[in-house]
UniProtKB/Swiss-Prot annotation:
SMART domains on file: MUTSac (SM00534), MUTSd (SM00533)
Keyword annotations of the record: ATP-binding, DNA damage, DNA repair, DNA-binding, Nucleotide-binding
Gene source species: Shouchella clausii (strain KSM-K16)
Protein name as it appears in the record: DNA mismatch repair protein MutS
Gene transcribed to yield this protein: mutS
Entries under InterPro entries matching the protein: DNA_mismatch_repair_MutS, DNA_mismatch_repair_MutS-lik_N, DNA_mismatch_repair_MutS/MSH, DNA_mismatch_repair_MutS_C, DNA_mismatch_repair_MutS_clamp, DNA_mismatch_repair_MutS_core, DNA_mismatch_repair_MutS_N, DNA_mismatch_repair_MutS_sf
């Protein structure tokens, strides 16, 4: 039997049909209600009560959240990646004929939030869209709707490069073409950290062409157009606050892929994904939300422009030379609210009176900020805008009360004296309420009832209340009974009824006029949006650079020299994060020398000795230098790097079914394929995910490839001590090691990196520190002693010859079995005949033209052969 729906439910179902991919928050009075599947899912996600509407088979699942506290529920759903369509009542229920008219006024998605309660203060909330066309690669457009910032970039490559760019961009939502191929759609769906939405239209609407006319590439315009159409569809209003699009050419900043950003823990830690423990946490001494967001952007996109870096360094130096003025400036900046997001909400028409008061207080600090900058010698760099905001500040000072309510419809927003008509209504309301207060006293005297009181509620209006015991004392004829309570009676009189009508009319007109006056003030403020956005950009930059000076002073950083050569020379270098979490003064400083013909350091030494820290230290120093910060070192001379590649740490990629070794090889492949002589490569323990000789052979081949083909500055750590012999034939490679000493059977890690190769790794000692059973570590020590007395095996027969992988095998693969055998038997030393399966794979290997394989194709072949052998 078909369900019989009420007119209201029919309205709900018609609207819901248009928003199948979102929760529909359907406004009913003081609640947002959800029905059917929305209700069931929302009740689970929000842990709220699931009820129902109707009876029996017609019962519809239902749940709801209060309108006034909806933000917290919305935030929880957004955090889980859901979309929410807000359906409001768009006509007054009192005047509605039939069902109240309702419309979806906006769609909230993870990438389109405007409400400051739903946003992280010091993080951008990016939405990204992309477009592609054949071999041209991908056009990427990105926008933070809450600030109005937009940028575009062009990347080359296939779907893997696209996915890396999206992941590295820190976006909350990605907009893909509706007709995206299924394979890429599936890969996008597997990604974590952002949701995927779809939009087909990609032309730039005419009213927004001015924002991107300076950019010629059609691919970028298509991506931007797709993003705009999605924003317009979800926001359902003009996007007047969007700023001119910024084009980021691929070579305009230091590139780091998602692996490098994660491994270096630039903005969050690998383990718990928190800011604490990251580079950002150490150097973020910004005091405004805007400055915090800008610093994060700088860290993720360091400069490659020597002049721009020098400009930032000069400001930091000026702030360091003027301590008192700098701290005075920072005190002023602490009084500045988030002008950038306030400007966006002003343009959006969603700013409230309390936020305009925040803007007023922020602008009142500008003259003092400008005066302080003049004292530091930076008056010409920023601002000089206080005069243009004088009228705006005066408007808000003369119109808005200092502590307005959040609601815009209940009055209390506008100061007395701003509008004559408003003052007249206020006088009427106040005089009427004074008359009411005096009425209570006069009625007590007239009736002799001391407990008589005058009250008010929304249902019955004003009333005179007396106890039942005293009701007989009221004179007949004048008092009309309005309500009977358990212990009291409520009455009205003709005079009270007349005065009530005047008061309520005045209050209603007062609230209506006050809202209209506020809307007019907000409209006048809207004319300043572009200027406010420029002001926000200036304040953000001075905040970041003043913070750089402050952290440099506190942590003893030095100004790096950015050289035009390729030399890297760091004296007394430190890891900026590690030094903050250990006892002050106990951090062991280290030098890094990659000058002259020293391009590559092969780092050996004990586990826990600090090899990975040493490698990350260099990369973080480079990032800090190229964002204009001072660096943790006694002296530092650095070139401009174009890219940083890292392969540090071990991690399976369970989501895509890739092993530790495959992940290791894929990340290494990126470095070998994309690095230039101006890149920095950090490779940690390459080859540990496979057998000893496979790993050693790969490590040597990779070192030789970097030496012969790329020539990039490289730090390569390894436990394969045999590789240290490469320094005899590769003239740009030097051996260094992390030192340790043994005292009375105890190993002391010195964390000092010195020239030369290490002779031991102390792995068994580290196992003891980890708490492995004594029986295990004792046995391991005995086996280690036995192995150390075995005859030395050659490991690098081809070390002194140029490597030709098509013709020459290394000794590691040609002269030994794949894995070291501790206890070989006579039977094990006999050559074994390959199985049928192995012969099949060998035949396929013989057919491969190695010289014409890309590294990725080679990895795919190896993966295919491994699967066949493991069947």
């Amino acid at each position: 039997m078909a369900q019989m729906h009420t007119p209201m439910m029919k309205q709900y179902l018609q609207i819901k049909a248009k928003y199948q991919d979102a929760f529909l928050f359907f406004r009913l009075g003081d609640f947002y209600e959800m029905f059917n599947e929305d209700a069931i899912k929302a009740a689970q996600e929000l842990e709220i009560t699931l009820t129902g509407r109707g009876q029996g088979e017609d019962r519809i699942p239902m749940c709801g959240v209060p309108y006034h506290s909806a933000d917290s529920y919305i935030a929880r759903l957004i955090d889980k990646g859901y979309k929410i369509a807000i359906c409001e009542q768009v006509e007054d229920p009192k005047t509605a004929k039939g069902v109240v008219k309702r419309e979806v006024t906006k769609v909230l998605t993870p990438g389109t939030l405007m409400n400051s309660k739903l946003l992280a203060e010091k993080e951008n909330n990016y939405l990204l869209a992309f477009a592609s066309e054949g071999e041209d690669g991908w056009g990427i457009a990105r926008c933070d709707l809450s600030t109005g910032e937009s940028d575009v970039t062009l990347i080359r490559g296939g779907s893997a490069e696209l996915l890396q760019e999206i992941a590295a961009s820190g976006v909350k939502e990605a907009i893909a073409p509706a007709g995206l191929e299924e394979e890429l759609k599936a890969k996008l769906g597997e990604q974590q950290g952002f949701v995927v939405s779809y939009e087909e239209q990609e032309d730039v609407p005419k009213e927004y062409e001015r924002l991107i006319n300076h950019i010629q590439q059609p691919l970028l315009k298509r991506a931007y157009g797709r993003m705009l159409h999605y924003l317009l569809a979800t926001q359902k209003q003009s996007l007047r606050h969007l700023q001119q699009v910024v084009f980021h050419p691929a070579d305009s900043y230091l590139k780091m892929d998602v692996h490098a950003k994660r491994n270096l823990e630039l903005v969050q830690t690998l383990r718990d994904k928190k800011k604490s423990g990251s580079l950002l946490a150490v150097i973020d001494q910004t005091v405004t939300a805007m400055g915090g967001r800008l610093l994060r952007q700088w860290i993720e996109r360091p400069l490659v422009d020597r002049k721009a870096i020098a400009g930032r360094q000069a400001v930091v130096e000026a702030f360091l030379e003027h301590f008192f003025e700098r701290e005075q400036l920072r005190d002023c900046l602490r009084q500045v609210y988030d002008i950038e997001r306030l400007a966006a909400r002003i343009a959006y028409g969603s700013v409230n009176a309390r936020e305009l008061v925040q803007l007023k207080r922020s602008l009142q600090n500008i003259p003092e900020i400008e005066a302080t900058l003049e004292q530091v010698g930076l008056g010409g760099r920023w601002l000089n805008q206080s005069e243009q905001f004088a009228d705006l500040v005066a408007l808000m000072e003369q119109s808005l009360v200092d502590d307005p309510p959040l609601s815009l419809t209940e009055g209390g927003l506008i100061v007395d004296g701003y509008n004559e008509e408003l003052d007249a209504y206020r006088d009427a309301s106040r005089n009427g309420k004074q008359w009411i207060a005096e009425l209570e006293q006069s009625e007590r005297e007239a009736t002799g009832i001391r407990s008589l009181k005058v009250g008010y509620n929304r249902v019955f209006g004003y009333y005179i209340e007396v106890t039942r015991a005293n009701a007989h004392l009221l004179p007949d004829g004048r008092y009309e009974r309005k309500q009977t309570l358990t212990n009291a009676e409520r009455y009205i009189t003709p005079e009270l009824k007349e005065k009530e009508a005047l008061i309520l009319e005045a209050d209603e007109k007062l609230a209506d006029l006050e809202y209209r006056l506020f809307a007019d003030i907000r409209k006048q403020v809207e004319a300043y949006v572009a200027s406010l956005q420029k002001l926000a950009a200036d304040i953000s930059e001075m905040d970041v650079l003043a913070g750089f000076a402050s952290v440099a002073e506190q942590n003893g950083y030095t100004k790096p020299t950015i050289t035009e050569s390729r030399d890297v020379a760091i004296k007394g270098g430190r890891h900026p994060v590690v030094e903050t979490v250990i006892k002050r003064g106990s951090y062991v400083e280290n030098d890094i020398d990659l000058t002259g013909d020293r391009d590559m350091l092969l780092i050996t030494g004990p586990n826990m000795g600090g090899k990975s820290t040493y490698m990350r230290q260099l990369a973080l120093t480079v990032v800090m230098a190229q964002i204009g910060s001072y660096v943790p070192a006694a002296e530092a001379t650095l070139p401009l790097f174009d890219q940083i590649f890292t392969r540090i740490g071990a991690a399976d990629d369970l989501a895509s079914g890739q092993s530790t070794f495959m992940v290791e090889m894929l990340e290494t492949k990126d470095a070998l394929v994309k690095a230039t002589p101006h890149s920095l490569i950090l490779l940690d323990e390459i080859g540990r995910g496979t057998s000893t000789y496979d790993g050693m052979a790969l490590a040597q081949a990779i070192i030789e490839y970097i030496y012969e083909t790329i020539g990039a500055k490289t730090l390569f750590s390894t436990h394969y001590h045999e590789l240290t012999r490469l320094a005899d034939s590769l003239h740009t490679l030097r051996n260094v090691h992390v030192s340790a000493v043994e005292e009375n059977g105890t190993v002391v890690f010195l964390h000092q990196v010195i020239e030369g190769a290490a002779d031991r790794s102390y792995g068994v000692y580290v196992a003891e520190l980890a708490g492995l059973p004594k029986q295990v570590t004792t046995r391991a020590e005995a086996l280690l002693t036995e192995l150390e007395h075995l005859p030395q095996r050659p490991t690098s027969a081809s070390v002194e010859q140029p490597v030709d992988s098509a013709k020459t095998e290394t000794a590691a693969t040609a002269e030994e079995p794949q894995q070291l055998s501790l206890f070989p038997t006579d039977e094990e030393t006999k050559p074994k005949q390959p199985t049928k399966k192995e012969r099949s794979v060998l035949a396929k290997m013989a057919e491969v033209d190695v010289l014409h394989l890309t590294p990725l194709q080679a990895l795919e072949k190896i993966n295919e052969w491994q699967k066949q052998l493991n069947k």
